[in-house]
């Protein structure tokens, strides 16, 4: 219909313009064609916009998009044709008498190709039927995402701070490591110096030991009541020690009553009648750990335990025995592999020169070592007896409390026969039944027995 109207208008214009001159008609035709071409371009752009708008709306995806095409430059052909979804066509025509607009058509075809390409790319993208709901969900998620982003930023700042602190800590540790290495180096030097000093002290002690034996013997001989005794009991049925019991005819080991010179009330003791000729008065025994030896001063002064088993005779009684004559000491030892050793001391006494032996702490006098166990007692000679509640040693600490025993500690010990019964090798240091010269400071012996006997005239 548009085409027919265009023809009618064209015919009328030809009839009316016949009297006019040709230049005027050509000018009008040129203007009219230009206007129509502009309208066609605007219409094509408008149609393209409508198509894009329709593609963005939530319409069912089954209807095909409109098809836009252009015609050729021949007569009676449409400039632009739009085929709608309902198969109807919209055509824009142009008068064939218009000037040659081949370049314009080429530009329009380029525009058409761009529009079609844009439509094709747009249609290739998936349609978002739930776009509003998605936008609402995104709007709901956005605050949480922002909050989480803030939290992550804070965590990142914390991690940076922690990294900085770790760096500072590593620097500090490196400094401490250097300082410790320096201290260890200095300690090694001090240790070497200490070892040399200890070696010098040991050599001096050995020299003093060699020089001190005659002096100790002289002191023991000067003790008024410690002369050599004749055989047999001084007053018939009252033996002063186990040697008197042996000389009275008793040959069996066991418990007997004795009556020392300075202890007329008497007390019972266990007598060893077999070792080295017999006649030994036992004052200490460890054999099974059944008796607690970690006790105080009063218990060690009075004695405790069972005479036929583990026991300590008592400092008061040992003093009474060793002040009535010159005594020798024999120490029997056994480990948990049934190995045995002994230590013998030719001179032994407790509180020999004390007016008040308890006040003086029952000091030890011992000399003249021989045997197979090695000497671990001479270092303690001259020391007072120390218990956990009465400290008489030369250490800053209480050796009895520290090494869980009671002994004539110096600083602190080379033997600890009244220590804990730890049954062989142990991780702790020097707190077992120890005789260091034989088994070291980390082995607790299975058996120990300390016994005394008067020095006989025939020796």
Curated annotation (Swiss-Prot):
Q: Which residues lie on this side of the membrane: Extracellular?
A: 55-459
Per the UniProt annotation, where are the glycans attached? 338
Protein's cellular compartments: Membrane
- Quote the record's binding site residues for Ca(2+): 391, 393
Region called Disordered, residue ranges: 1-22
Q: Which InterPro entries match?
A: Fibrinogen-like_C (IPR036056), Fibrinogen_a/b/g_C_1 (IPR014716), Fibrinogen_a/b/g_C_dom (IPR002181), Fibrinogen_C-term_domain (IPR050373), Fibrinogen_CS (IPR020837)
- Topology relative to the membrane: Single-pass type II membrane protein
| Record-annotated membrane-spanning stretches | 34-54
Which residue stretches are annotated as topological domain Cytoplasmic? 1-33
> Per the record, where is site Implicated in ligand binding?
403, 413, 429-430
Identify the SMART domains for this entry.
FBG
UniProt keyword annotation of Metal-binding present:
yes
Q: Which residues form the Fibrinogen C-terminal domain?
A: 233-456
Which positions form S-S bridges?
242-271, 399-412
Family annotation (CDD domains)? FReD
Q: What GO molecular function annotations does the UniProt record carry, in alphabetical order?
A: chitin binding; metal ion binding
Q: Name one GO cellular component term.
A: membrane
Q: What does this protein do?
A: Acetyl group-binding receptor which shows a high-affinity and calcium-dependent binding to acetylated structures such as chitin, some N-acetylated carbohydrates, and amino acids, but not to their non-acetylated counterparts. Can facilitate the endocytosis of acetylated components.
Q: Please report the name of this protein according to its UniProt entry.
A: Fibrinogen C domain-containing protein 1
């Amino acid at each position: 219909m548009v085409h027919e109207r265009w023809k009618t208008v064209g015919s009328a214009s030809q009839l009316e313009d016949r009297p006019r001159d040709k230049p005027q008609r050509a000018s009008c035709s040129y203007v009219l064609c230009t206007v129509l071409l502009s309208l066609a371009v605007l219409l094509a752009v408008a149609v393209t916009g409508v198509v894009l708008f329709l593609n963005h709306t939530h319409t069912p995806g089954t209807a095909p998009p409109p098809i836009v095409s252009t015609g050729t430059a021949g007569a009676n052909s449409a400039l632009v044709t739009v085929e709608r979804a309902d198969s109807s066509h919209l055509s824009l025509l142009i008068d064939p008498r218009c000037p040659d607009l081949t370049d314009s058509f080429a530009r329009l075809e380029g525009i058409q190709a761009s529009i079609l390409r844009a439509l094709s790319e747009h249609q290739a993208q998936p349609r978002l039927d739930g776009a509003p709901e998605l936008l609402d969900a995104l709007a709901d998620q956005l605050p949480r995402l922002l909050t989480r982003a803030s939290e992550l930023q804070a965590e990142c700042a914390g991690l940076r701070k922690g990294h900085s602190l770790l760096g500072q800590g590593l620097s500090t540790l490196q400094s401490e490591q250097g300082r410790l290495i320096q201290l260890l180096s200095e300690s090694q030097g001090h240790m070497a110096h200490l070892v040399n000093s200890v070696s010098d002290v040991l050599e001096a002690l050995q020299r003093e030991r060699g020089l001190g034996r005659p002096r100790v013997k002289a002191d023991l001989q000067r003790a008024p009541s410690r002369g050599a005794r004749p055989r047999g009991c001084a007053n018939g049925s009252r033996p002063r020690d186990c040697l008197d019991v042996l000389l009275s005819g008793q040959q069996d080991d066991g418990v007997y009553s004795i009556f020392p010179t300075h202890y007329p009330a008497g007390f019972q003791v266990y007598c060893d009648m077999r070792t080295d000729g017999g006649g030994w008065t036992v004052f200490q025994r460890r054999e099974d750990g059944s008796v607690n030896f970690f006790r105080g001063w009063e218990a060690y002064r009075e004695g405790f335990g069972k005479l036929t088993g583990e026991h300590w005779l008592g400092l008061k009684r040992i003093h009474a025995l060793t002040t009535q004559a010159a005594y020798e000491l024999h120490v029997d030892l056994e480990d948990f592999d049934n190995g045995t050793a002994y230590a013998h001391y030719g001179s032994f006494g407790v509180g020999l020169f004390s007016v008040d032996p308890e006040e003086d702490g029952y000091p030890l006098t011992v000399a003249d070592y021989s045997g197979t166990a090695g000497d671990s007692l001479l270092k303690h000679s001259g020391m007072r007896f120390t218990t956990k509640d009465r400290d008489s040693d030369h250490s800053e600490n209480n050796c009895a409390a520290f090494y869980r025993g009671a002994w004539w500690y110096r600083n602190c010990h080379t033997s600890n026969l009244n220590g804990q019964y730890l049954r062989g090798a142990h991780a702790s240091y020097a707190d077992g039944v120890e005789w260091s010269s034989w088994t070291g400071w980390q082995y607790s012996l299975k058996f120990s027995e300390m016994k005394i006997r008067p020095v006989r005239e025939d020796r």
